[in-house]
Curated annotation (Swiss-Prot):
Physiological role: The UvrABC repair system catalyzes the recognition and processing of DNA lesions. A damage recognition complex composed of 2 UvrA and 2 UvrB subunits scans DNA for abnormalities. Upon binding of the UvrA(2)B(2) complex to a putative damaged site, the DNA wraps around one UvrB monomer. DNA wrap is dependent on ATP binding by UvrB and probably causes local melting of the DNA helix, facilitating insertion of UvrB beta-hairpin between the DNA strands. Then UvrB probes one DNA strand for the presence of a lesion.
Protein name, entry field: UvrABC system protein B
Keyword Heme listed: no
Family annotation (CDD domains): DEXHc_UvrB (cd17916), SF2_C_UvrB (cd18790)
Stretches that traverse the bilayer: none
One GO cellular component, as annotated: cytoplasm
Domain free text: The beta-hairpin motif is involved in DNA binding.
């Protein structure tokens, strides 16, 4: 099933890229464990890494610091490798509240979560690709260091079907139930199956557009065919097919029974400790909760919060690292840590926060001590598991530089000839009015502006002020979910609005060639948001435009500002020299705007169900303003049918959306008649 990596690009490496590719490949072939690619904004770091992957033909994991950047990298890698398996692995929670206990107020907070089904499907697809083929690039967030099902148990649970195989229908249905698939003869959706006579239709959990039909003749598999679950159209017949579990956390029955005995033993030991310390309430609470979980596991094979017993289910000893996505990556895999100056500290911080919360739960009898082994990797465990690693950043941190030693590969020259932005420092007193006049100049020539503030309050007030003065502005904040965040960035590039205001979200890696001005308010306030690295990264957002400019508002030049300005000037001079030597005229990037995640219908659904925090409007079914009365009438009739269908299916939000659109269409129809 694997194919060789085949790089699809209209460009050949140029500038500093060929030398960077050669040095990275030589380092990997010589067995170097750590290398750093120091590449400035817009120098084509992703293209360099794609060339290294294609030349070395090794399965690769790319770690990104957040979902937004992971989505952008996923889109770019998919364009570079359209014929290979490019996968996306990030946290599938749209909302997550872990269970916690607050002793001071005696408050227990139950676990509450909302799972994004589409991202869950993409996670399953990623692990399937890693198990089945070698031409894989998995773009992951820090979610990759969190516990995942044991790959050995996961492989044991797979159901292999081949044409001519002898197996009765009830055995297939029983195996599907073990894989946590549910029978649903009415609504056929991901992770379900339906039975019609001797035909079983299965919708694989890792697929979003293809299902499997198993046709039996008595106790023999007569035919296996792949079909479109929406239309029922048969795409092809296959000689064999492997059905993967619906979740990464499935466990064989015998392992569950064994784990239950181990849980009972630990419960007995823990009860003795609590009683010896006169903690009667905690002992009673722990016994009741654990016995309930054991009963559920015995009857159903799983329970709510089963991840807290993961140590027993995967057969690990106390303190051993949990199985993670790294266990699915082949031994000769390659790890690329993008924006490493942010990603590496993130990995280091995950374990401690999780540990503090779990210790309280254990101490007060909500969980057994083994629950503390359901955790992300410690930093030293990550280091031990990580294969050969390339750190990628425009501003590498001390850790990467220390690990790489002399193996820092510079990529400062941009093939496009683009220079780093011109930097100006202006006084704080008039920053808002000055910014408004700058925005108007840029909007007049169809260019975009990014504004970064220090606080959420300042960002909200500034957005309101700019709106009052007639500017098309949006505010990007932490409450906006992943998909909508990508939509906002896409809308900025398309010119739906001119100004994007943010706090810490407009930094690493965001690729927006239309942005010609970056304004940094209160740049002279020293702190992590105005450190040398933060300033260089933020200034870099304007480095993809020919007219790139950065304005730092401050009454004094801090050491961080001086270093950031000095480094930007150094890079600008080096690029200028390269351009003069090679006769290059700087050219803007004409990068096409695409739906990075290509989530299809899910984007529309997410926007419809969104909380309206992003000031976005859902655009269901685009309507041309110059439609003829006849075409409008036809469209109205079509949408009325859709609205009634949604109402019958109890999908009232979608029906209401179409109702609002019908109201606008009828007004257009009256005006046109």
């Amino acid at each position: 099933m694997s194919k060789p990596f085949k790089l699809n690009s209209a460009f050949k490496p140029s500038g500093d890229q060929p030398d960077a590719i050669r040095r990275l490949e030589e380092g990997l072939e010589d067995g170097l464990a750590h290398q750093t690619l120091l590449g400035v904004t817009g120098s084509g770091k992703t293209f360099t890494i794609a060339n290294v992957i294609a030349d070395l033909q090794r399965p690769t994991m790319v770690l990104a610091p957040n979902k937004t950047l992971a989505a952008q990298l996923y889109g770019e890698m998919k364009e570079f490798f359209p014929e290979n398996a490019v996968e996306y692995f990030v946290s599938y929670y749209d909302y997550y509240q872990p269970e916690a206990y607050v002793p001071s107020s005696d408050t227990f907070i139950e676990k509450d979560a909302s799972v994004n089904e589409h991202i869950e499907q993409m996670r399953l697809s990623a692990t399937k690709a890693l198990l089945e083929r070698r031409d894989v690039v998995v773009v992951a967030s820090v979610s990759a260091i969190y516990g995942l099902g044991d790959p050995d148990l996961y492989l044991k649970m797979m159901l292999h079907l081949t044409v001519g195989m002898l197996i009765d229908q009830r055995a297939i249905l029983r195996r599907l139930a073990e894989l946590q698939y549910t029978r649903n003869d009415q609504a056929f959706q991901r992770g379900t199956f339906r039975v019609r006579g001797e035909v079983i239709d299965i919708f694989p959990a890792e697929s979003d557009d293809i299902a499997l039909r198993v046709e039996l003749f008595d106790e023999e598999v007569e035919r296996l065919s792949l079909f479109d679950p929406l239309t029922g159209q048969v795409e092809s017949t296959v000689p064999r097919y492997t059905i993967y579990p619906k979740t990464h956390y499935v466990t064989p029955r015998e392992r569950i029974l064994q784990a239950m005995e181990e849980i009972k033993d630990e419960l007995a030991d823990r009860r003795k400790v609590l009683l010896a310390n006169n903690k009667l309430l905690e002992e009673q609470r722990l016994s009741q909760r654990t016995q309930f979980d054991l009963e559920m596991m015995n009857e159903l094979g799983y329970c709510s919060g089963i991840e807290n017993y993961s140590r027993f289910l995967s057969g690990r000893g106390p303190g051993e690292p949990p199985p993670t996505l790294f266990d699915y990556l082949p031994a000769d895999g390659l790890l690329v840590v993008d924006e490493s100056h942010v990603t590496i500290p993130q990995i280091g911080g995950m374990y401690r926060g999780d540990r503090a919360r779990k210790e309280t739960l254990v101490e007060y009898g909500f969980r057994l001590p083994s629950a503390m082994d359901n955790r992300p990797l410690k930093f030293e465990e990550f280091e031990a598991l990580a294969p050969q690693t390339i750190y990628v950043s425009a501003t590498p941190g001390n850790y990467e530089l220390e690990k790489s030693g002399d193996e820092v590969v510079d990529q400062v020259v941009r093939p496009t000839g683009l220079l780093d932005p011109i930097i100006e420092v202006r006084p704080v007193a008039t920053q808002v009015d000055d910014l408004l006049s700058e925005i108007r100049q840029r909007a007049a020539i169809n260019e975009r502006v990014l504004v970064t503030t220090l606080t959420k309050r300042m960002a909200e007030d500034l957005t309101e002020y700019l709106e009052e003065h007639g500017e098309r502005v949006r505010y990007l904040h932490s409450d906006i979910d992943t998909v909508e965040r990508m939509e906002i960035i896409r809308d900025l590039r398309l010119g739906e609005f001119d100004v994007l205001v943010g706090i810490n979200l407009l930094r690493e890696g965001l690729d927006m060639p239309e942005v010609s001005l970056v304004a940094i308010l209160d740049a002279d306030k020293e702190g992590f948001l105005r450190s040398e690295r933060s300033l260089i990264q933020t200034i870099g957002r304007a480095a993809r435009n020919v007219n790139g400019k950065a304005i730092l508002y401050g009454d004094k030049i801090t050491p961080s500002m001086a270093k950031a300005i000095g480094e930007t000037e150094r890079r600008r001079e080096k690029q200028q020299k390269y351009n003069e030597e090679h006769g290059i005229t700087p050219q803007g990037l004409n990068k096409k705007v695409v739906d990075i995640l290509a989530l299809g219908q899910n984007i529309a659904k997410t926007k419809a169900k969104g909380k309206g925090k992003g000031r976005s409007t859902a655009k269901a079914g685009i309507v041309e303003l110059d439609m003829t009365p006849k075409a409008l009438q036809q469209k109205i009739h079509e949408l009325e049918g859709q609205m009634m269908q949604h109402a019958q299916n109890l999908e009232f939000e979608e029906a209401a959306q179409i109702r609002d659109q019908l109201h606008q269409l009828r007004e257009l129809f009256i005006a046109a008649s």
